[in-house]
Amino acid sequence: MQTVNDKIVIVVEIFPGAQRPYYIKSQGMVEGTYVRVSGTTRHVEGYMLKELILEGQNRYFDCEICRDMQVSDSDIEKFCKRLKETAIKNTWQESEKAKIKDVTKNILISWGILKEEEGKVYPTNAYALLTGKMPQQPVIQCGIFKGTNRAHFVDRREFEGPIQEQMEAAYQYVLEKINMGMTIRGMYRQDVYELPTDSIRELIANAVAHRSYLEPGNIQVALFGDRLEITSPGMLLNNVTISKMMEGYSKPVSYTHLTLPTTE
């Protein structure tokens, strides 16, 4: 119970149900499903309805079989080899490199990258995304803008291919375009980017990992004179609201700002 304008009111919080989507029975699932967006009630879009159906069945898009793609044992072996090579490449300490184990078909199945049905192995959407062979493979679009809005366009790049390679390319592109300063520590000079590189990488990685791959559209990385904006397609995750985000809610968000430091 709460007091509002000197009146006692009962506040009821209704949590989302598990058997989604909920719809008006007389209109049917396709025509009778609605969502709340920015304080308005709207007819659900096709991609969002697919997401609701998967959620209601406790299924996930990346673990679904990619019916438009076939995979051979040779393809799987090459992919496993690339995964291990990537892990070794991104590990700095030799002692840690020695601990990296081979990736096998069974491991990919346990990760949901491959799926086994009736003794046959199929590629999932995750496999297609990680190999760059997804029908209508999404890309990362990067743009540089002069000032604090999109009125003056300076440069643009679009990165294709496997999503993990897109992520690395977008990260390197941002590093090339932001300013670099320096700091003195003891007797030595150390180069320092104007934005924390770990945060940039984390933001791009979150955009790739948590976007909606059912929604048409691409991740956009926009660098302005005073900030970096990264936007990924999709709605907020279940049980995530703007107010919870402002309170430090720990789940990832679809849109994020990274503000540049200012000097006087």
How should each PLM-predicted stretch be described?
Residues 1-260, 264:
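Conserved N-terminal catalytic/coupling substructures associated with nucleotide/phosphate chemistry
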